[in-house]
């Protein structure tokens, strides 16, 4: 039954977006935006990262051996891209194999090949690890074949051609030129995979809070995807410890226990072990490590819509980082977004289509929102977020 509900939910979101796009087409402001031709309104690389790897004559060395690496190898096999070896950070080499390849040090491949292309297949925001990757890029071509955190649709040429109109519309809806520059870089990185693009578009997280989000002592913060309380802690710091209410939600039970432990001494704090979607009831949930936890699976947990979660409160700031359910949460939260117009921080990177579907949906729900985009230091382009005010 819960699978039927989940499918129905996705259909409802699709219908909602199509209905809203139809309405947008009727508005004079948006007619011009929708009159686009089958090309992007900004320049990107001529070849996708997959096409670059298919055409290269250099050996291809994979850096990383986790879940993302498995996904990339599967696509390599499908596209007949030849992999020549696998490497890892020095502490993770050891005597082991990955997908039939012995995991070797970078020095081993330097000596064996001299010149080669490196593909990054893991995620990190650790400064030392990121700096090491950027240093490697000074001597070798480093590409990042992006695979979505949730879903299987990659940002290749077919994907780009299928969604050109939506990408152009989302780009036009952004509130400022800086956000548009970041959007252009993000799309180019997802498509072309050049590591240096990330350096060009990254900003420290403090910048957006200092220039766009202004907190006061009356903030009611709703943290959807609160994890262990890291963003609660960050909010309190940014609000100088003065706020009205914090509501934190985390679907994973073990992580939720750490959340309530870390926040047990906070004043005016309420927490829920639940998933926020577009309906009230129950939904399947897969409790896996880190970013692999997601909606779908045999473990049934409580599901709440945003209006139900916020009943009795007037949210002023909502963070949504829900491993791929952002569209459903927003569509189910239309009442909240229209009634209170809370400031929002919405993850833009879980699914390939999030980068354009999310701003289109937000604008369709409440056209008064000014939508900003930022990418904070991370490889690949995770921690790319919409900030709406």
Language model segments and positions:
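Phosphate/nucleotide-binding beta-alpha loop and adjacent structural elements of enzyme active sites
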Residues: 24-83, 89-389
